[in-house]
Amino acid sequence: MNRTRALVCLFLAVLILAHESEAQCRRLCYRNRCVTYCRGRGKRSVEEPSGGAQVVEKRAVDDADIPSAVEERELDEEESIEFR
């Protein structure tokens, strides 16, 4: 029983690591504000420099809020967002 439990735990750990490695992150910047979206992790960080310091805020976000490739292409055409 302990051997089976250990194998199940190992299998779950591998699945979690595989999911984390598939996270796709994109960094979008507009004026003085940069947003990093990580698709696989479901998190994003918002960076807004104020004065000389940077404030980084992390919060959970739905994958539906992440721009698709088509939306990113439209933003590129408008040239309103700089990709870094």
UniProtKB/Swiss-Prot annotation:
<feature type="modified residue" description="Pyrrolidone carboxylic acid">
    <location>
        <position position="24"/>
    </location>
</feature>
<keyword id="KW-0873">Pyrrolidone carboxylic acid</keyword>
<keyword id="KW-0044">Antibiotic</keyword>
<keyword id="KW-0732">Signal</keyword>
<dbReference type="GO" id="GO:0005576">
    <property type="term" value="C:extracellular region"/>
</dbReference>
<feature type="signal peptide">
    <location>
        <begin position="1"/>
        <end position="23"/>
    </location>
</feature>
<feature type="disulfide bond">
    <location>
        <begin position="25"/>
        <end position="38"/>
    </location>
</feature>
<feature type="disulfide bond">
    <location>
        <begin position="29"/>
        <end position="34"/>
    </location>
</feature>
<dbReference type="GO" id="GO:0042742">
    <property type="term" value="P:defense response to bacterium"/>
</dbReference>
<comment type="function">
    <text>Antibacterial peptide.</text>
</comment>
<feature type="modified residue" description="Arginine amide">
    <location>
        <position position="41"/>
    </location>
</feature>
<keyword id="KW-1015">Disulfide bond</keyword>
<feature type="propeptide">
    <location>
        <begin position="42"/>
        <end position="84"/>
    </location>
</feature>
<protein>
    <recommendedName>
        <fullName>Gomesin-like peptide</fullName>
    </recommendedName>
</protein>
<keyword id="KW-0964">Secreted</keyword>
<keyword id="KW-0929">Antimicrobial</keyword>
<keyword id="KW-0027">Amidation</keyword>
